[in-house]
Amino acid sequence: GVLALLDGANTLNSGAAALDNGLGQLTDGLDTLTSNNAALNSAAQQVADGVLASANKTLKEGGLIDNDMTWSDYASVIDNILTMNDKTLAAGRRKIVRTVWEQAPSFKDSQLDLALYLSATKTNHDLEAALKLMQSYDPSMITGLVQLLTSEDAKNAAHEELVYQVKNSQDMADVAALKTSLSQIQVFVSSVNQYTAGVQSAADGAHSAKDGSAQLAAGTQTLYDGVNTLNNGAGQLSDGTVQLNDGLNQFNDEGISKLTG
């Protein structure tokens, strides 16, 4: 019985030692991963901030924003741009004139509206042709034309044309896509942060398990040592019992038998 108990204690001790060793390897691996957490989080944020800085530069150059967007307000800022406010229309005016009349001087809004109206009429004139046409007219003819085209109906038509061109421009499509890109980069940063937090949590759990397994291994070793001591004591007890039995037999043979002879 004692030998069976000793064998079981030995098996338990070996298993506890193997568990402790395995958890030691796991904690070492997780510690290596967690040592890179700060670098990963920082790198992800740097990538995101670089994208945001590029977006700010592009929108500023387009005249769509004056102040830099932040991660907390970029969505509302871009939504505001896409609602066709005065800043968007002003940027649209500059964009249209810049692309079709690169060398033109700075125009007032009323002149731009007039040029846009001329380009929007069904006369097969683009903006450049309309401006050249204005320059070639006799001053008195230009005065009459301006009076005609700056009527309320003409202004409304020019404004509607400008709204249509800005709203349907590639620039506005790019602005809408920019919002999606910034949202995706935020998801990327959040995912990296969640990963590193998960690694840290796993490492903390592994360390707790490792501490427990070390205590278990120490306990099973103590148990094994105790059973082994018991086994050795049982052997000594057996030897002592034999010796006692031999002594009693000898005492009986040499003492008691002679007395009762």
Regions found by a protein language model. Give the residues of each.
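Long, amphipathic alpha-helical coiled-coil
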Residues: 1-261
